[in-house]
Amino acid sequence: MKLVIAEKPSVAQSLAAVIGATARKDGYLEGNGWRVSWCVGHLAGLADADSYDPKYAKWRYDDLPILPEHWQMVVGKDKKKQFDVLKKLINAPDVTEVVNACDAGREGELIFRSVYELAGCQKPMKRLWISSMEDSAIREGFANLRPGVDYDGLRDAALCRAKADWLVGINATRLFSVLYHRTLNIGRVMSPTLALIVQREAEIDTFKQVPFYTVALELPGLTVSGERMADKAAAEQLKEACQGAAATIKKVECKEKSEKPPALYDLTTLQRDANRLLGFTAQQTLDYLQSLYEKKLCTYPRTDSRYLTGDMADSLPVLVNLVANAMPFRKGIAITCDPQTVINDKKVTDHHAVIPTRNLKDADLSALPAGEKAVLELVALRLLCAVAQPHIYSETVVIATCAGRKFTAKGKTVKHPGWKALEDAYRAKMKDAEPKKEGAEKALPELTEGQILSVAAAIVNEGKSSPPQHFTEDTLLSAMETAGKEDMPEDAERKGLGTPATRAGILEKLVSAGFLERKKSRKTVQLLPSHDAVSLITVLPEQLQSPLLTAEWEYRLGEIERGQLAPEEFLDGISTMLKDLVGTYQVIKGTEYLFTPPREVVGKCPRCGGEVAELQKGFFCQNDSCRFAIWKNNKWWAAKKKQPTKAVVSALLNDGRVRVIGLYSEKTGKTYDATVVLEDDGQYANFKLEFDQRKGGSR
């Protein structure tokens, strides 16, 4: 009997169906010589600090740094039941071999190995390594199970990553929390990511716009523009000199150019496009893609490759054809397939690029949740574009002179749309599709060198230098991928912050910790640092906020994975850094009030007329002699399964009432809408409901 352990129940069921383990048992499936069970994510993890010594339960400066000599793994209390099932199955006398079928990546390896080792197992171990949940891929994977020891490097890298996160998180968080008298969560990758955002905001705040001027000349059939000028008076003078004069065509240059199709998606580039085009967060895109993977409609999500392997070349045209037939936006567009544009064995390590599967042919795409369908269409579009013909166009550059100054114009004529026909068709169906800029692809009239044209009008256009842009998830993911180095060549070996598999989770942790705020601005959602984020980066030393140093650590984890670096050497470096940090760091003078956020006033106090501001536990009058308060855990609101928000309290203070939707009735168990009225008796803030008045906006 062979035991297969998957990462989650849904995957276990898919595997079991293919290998014939169809009989349901308590916590596993069985049949055809196989037992198939599952983890529920990480069943075990590194023990807390107080497991090594009870004194570590309290945070004290004198105990730092905490550096375990012998690491302990413990099973989570809420995961013990499933661990016990797996332990019993692993150690069953009739089980001769254990197959690791957890996700084919660093974390999947650690999930399985933790269970395998805590169960005390020494039985032969094999690895199922697949990039698709299609039945054919599963059958092929089981026919070619690999020796488990081949992935010892992957396990070592995953465990070192977990230990490094533990060491930095435990020691740095305790050190700075004790020194600055408040909880400051610090992470090995979180903090340098936050530093990128804080640095960008500082650049925006200190940016000074500089005006510039250009002179444009209206000629028959085209407009030519001069170079930027810093002096407005000089621009006006040039305008006057050109007005009514003649311009001479000095040069006409026409070149045929070709724009290659884009590469296929890896996880990060898909997350970036899904954020830019669809407004999805990185985590949402990963969740949608993971679901599509488990539904056998897309290949493995957590990949860092943008290419396919040579053995996929022959079957690719069939896949491209069925994907094209399933996508409504490609109607009327001829589909071509050049497999060689996406095949590169040297650029595929663990998993190939994200592509749709052949199961798309029989799938009811209309039944998919909207988010999954949108991501699937994006993945399908990229496959069709990547194997399509190049976009070919001719570009004409005209240089003219007038009043002794040079003016230029560019024109573009599309010769063959190639892959861009698909992209244009996809964008045209989007609700928020941006209209094409006028003149962006406008052809220029036939001109000859030496030709003289009259100037119909001369205009001075004023512009201003642009500040750096606020980060969006699209641009932040790009910065994380290159550790903030904007000029890194595409083919350079990446030393980034985190991995494709972890970046989405890092962003979500920063948001949930209150360090980042998502703020919508027009069609984009910006990532803005909070007051606490700026304060934290102000006091953190370079080694904890340097993107380049953290990226170097990530690169060394890759070396461990490849067997090029001993885990002990990596962890010794982390420990040495922490010893130095604890021994040398001193509180920065003048930062006593750094972590006291400015209090936002939400309204006037109904008792004394003072200002009411939001604090952590509620909304309080800032007049020291006044006791007015609306607590966030107010029992009246809690009974209705609501919490007074800033918008609700502001309306109550300013209007005395607010319309609230979705209030819960303890009597009926249903929800209802009503107007909440504030009644203050001088001692307590009370509330009552009105059902016949609808004053105030809904909240």
Give the role of each language-model region.
Residues K295-P301:
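Secretory-pathway/luminal and periplasmic proteins that interact with or process carbohydrate-rich
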Residues A233-Y265, Q271:
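Metal- or metallocofactor-binding catalytic centers and their adjacent structured scaffolds
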Residues M1-A162, W166, M430, P467:
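Intrinsically disordered, low-complexity regulatory segments
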